[in-house]
Amino acid sequence: MLDAFRDSLFHQRCFPTSDPASRESLVRWVDKNLADPASHMIIAERDISPAHPLRSAPPAGTVADADAPPPPVAGFARWVRRPTPSTAPAPAPAPARDSSPPPPPPAAPEPRMVFTPDMYPAGGDATLAARVFQANYDALMQATSGRDAWFLSMLVVPREHQRRGVGTALLRYGLERADRDGWAAYVNASSEGKPLYDKNGFATVERSEFGDIVEHHMLREPEGKS
């Protein structure tokens, strides 16, 4: 699955797959997010089964089938469901004769995360990684302040699987849920990926430039519920 990152200019610079520490960092990232209950990791696999299997092909579930290598990864995405902590003012105190417990206080605002170079592998450009992730995080927090949102944390489709509907399918997974919930959808898009989001209702609310790496911070309003 890590080979899917090879076409990303940002990952080539900051997490080169030739660097063992960078590869391990990406593996840890995937493992961490697979265990995150708020994360939805969607993996698209290339169908390598023949259209008409040979009569002698072993049935599914046999030892031969279990030992077969997994299908190649055609792309993957991580969607995060981000409900906004309640910031509504507390109701007025109840009359003294009311013995019911007081309502809980409103949730505290989410503390700002700070990204530093020591958080990233030295085999890549750790300073650039910290700058990009900080800009992306700050833009996310600003664009979705006070709003529930589905956040597309990552969508990666290798070049050989592009223009086959893989990216659109991975994108629709979260957009359908955002529309069902009546929530906004948010993504930090590269210049290469931006046309896909343009076609699916996203609008750029801000952009950050890091030399030849440009991040487009994009928001999509929910469509009518079905």
Tell me the role of every PLM-derived stretch.
Residues 11-67:
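Active-site rim helix/loop that mediates acceptor-substrate recognition in acyltransferases
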Residues 31, 39-45, 50-54, 76, ...:
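Short hydrophobic/aromatic beta-strand element in the GNAT-like acyltransferase core
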Residues 168, 180-182, 191-214:
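Conserved active-site alpha-helix within GNAT-family acetyltransferase domains
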Residues 154-162, 186-195, 210-215, 219-224:
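Conserved beta-strand-loop-alpha-helix junction that forms the acyl-donor binding cleft
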Residues 154-157, 163-176, 199:
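Conserved acetyl-CoA-binding loop-helix of GNAT-fold acetyltransferases
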Residues 148-150, 177-190:
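Conserved GNAT acetyl-CoA-binding A-motif
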Residues 1:
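Non-catalytic, usually N-terminal nucleic-acid engagement modules in DNA/RNA processing proteins
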Residues 55-162:
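Conserved acyl-donor/pantetheine-binding loop and adjacent beta-alpha core of acyl/acetyltransferases
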